[in-house]
Curated annotation (Swiss-Prot):
Annotated GO CC locations: ribonucleoprotein complex; ribosome
Keyword tRNA-binding part of the UniProt annotation: yes
The name this protein goes by in its record: Large ribosomal subunit protein uL5
Origin species: Vibrio campbellii (strain ATCC BAA-1116)
GO molecular function annotations of the record: rRNA binding; structural constituent of ribosome; tRNA binding
Gene expressing this chain: rplE
Function: This is one of the proteins that bind and probably mediate the attachment of the 5S RNA into the large ribosomal subunit, where it forms part of the central protuberance. In the 70S ribosome it contacts protein S13 of the 30S subunit (bridge B1b), connecting the 2 subunits; this bridge is implicated in subunit movement. Contacts the P site tRNA; the 5S rRNA and some of its associated proteins might help stabilize positioning of ribosome-bound tRNAs.
Organism lineage: Bacteria, Pseudomonadati, Pseudomonadota, Gammaproteobacteria, Vibrionales
Family: Belongs to the universal ribosomal protein uL5 family.
Superkingdom in the source lineage: Bacteria
One Gene Ontology term from the biological process aspect of the record: translation
PANTHER family in the cross-refs: 60S RIBOSOMAL PROTEIN L11-RELATED
């Protein structure tokens, strides 16, 4: 079991129950899933780019990504409905906890000029979204084998009802919020 999951069960639940005075343990917010998304707009011209992006995503997440397709045609972007334009992965359970641990302790500190992530990126329902400009911050990615530096979106979905509860949950995991 991931260390972060043990820490959640042993410390975070008690801490948040006291802070928000919950009456039941089931009211305590928990992380439900982490979604990684990588848009590869250049894949219209070169299918190899999407394959490489999917391989990077699989290496980062530990599971095979789903290829996302365009929902509708947009002439300005030169895409048609059904064109493969990106990939995404939804992490739950053990893989989710392991990814979160790697993100907080290894990947984010490797970002150049890192001063913390914005505490304002909550959606109003306790879910947190952030972007990473380079996939090479993850230690699994071999810098020499990368064909192109790509970014990805990371969404942490929680069961929290408000942004305040979601922020408290992530802060309990020592999530590096900007001061």
């Amino acid at each position: 079991m991931a260390k972060l999951h043990d820490y959640y069960k042993s410390s975070v639940v008690a801490e948040l129950t006291k802070q928000f005075s919950y009456t039941s343990v089931m009211q305590v917010p928990r992380i439900e899933k982490i979604t990684l998304n990588m848009g590869v707009g250049e894949a219209i011209n070169d299918k190899k780019l999407l394959e490489n992006a999917a391989a990077d995503m699989a290496t980062i997440s530990g599971q095979k990504p789903l290829i996302t397709k365009a929902r509708k045609s947009v002439a300005g972007f030169k895409i048609r409905e059904g064109y493969p334009i990106g990939c995404k992965v939804t992490l739950r359970g053990e893989r989710m906890w392991e990814f979160l641990e790697r993100l907080i302790s290894i990947a984010l500190p490797r970002v150049r000029d890192f001063r913390g992530v914005s505490a304002k990126s909550f959606d109003g329902r306790g879910n947190y979204s952030m972007g990473v400009r380079e996939q090479i911050i993850f230690p699994e990615i071999d810098f020499d084998k990368v064909d192109r530096v790509r970014g990805l979106d990371i969404t942490i979905t929680t069961s929290a009802g408000t942004d305040e509860e979601g922020r408290a949950l992530l802060a309990a995991f020592n999530f590096p919020f900007r001061k």
